[in-house]
């Protein structure tokens, strides 16, 4: 009977891992693509294209195939009190859970702005998807351009 009350042991784990330290955040800030709107900033780094050195934290963390995304949340005290900051973090985590297939292979850092606290979940989701799709489109366009070779005159 006690086993019936417990949660299932094979409950799926979250499809993302979090960025752990300053060096990981700095790598996304410096090498990643930035996109801003009036509610938050999103920094995206294609972690699958990072060099696979042994000491590279992205390579070590993404070799587990179940953890296909790295997520970092940087919510400052300017956004609101602790309750509001935690609400924003919960919403952003659930967005990454809900749209895990779009985030696959990326390291994401969200930096919410003060106006983000007044958004409801559906509006936040709309802005998140618009930003992520535009970033992926830009990265694909940029990738196609760099792989093109030209004949020498």
From Swiss-Prot:
- Protein name (Swiss-Prot/TrEMBL): Ribonuclease P protein component
Query: Its encoding gene is what?
Result: rnpA
Regarding protein family, the annotation reads:
Belongs to the RnpA family.
Arranged from A to Z, the UniProt key words for this protein are: Endonuclease, Hydrolase, Nuclease, RNA-binding, tRNA processing
Which EC class, in a word?
Answer: hydrolase
Q: Known InterPro entries for this protein?
A: Ribosomal_Su5_D2-typ_SF, Ribsml_uS5_D2-typ_fold_subgr, RNase_P, RNase_P_CS
What organism is the protein native to? Helicobacter acinonychis (strain Sheeba)
Q: Identify one Gene Ontology CC term for this UniProt entry.
A: ribonuclease P complex
EC number assigned by the record: 3.1.26.5
Which catalysed reactions does the entry list for this protein?
Answer: Endonucleolytic cleavage of RNA, removing 5'-extranucleotides from tRNA precursor
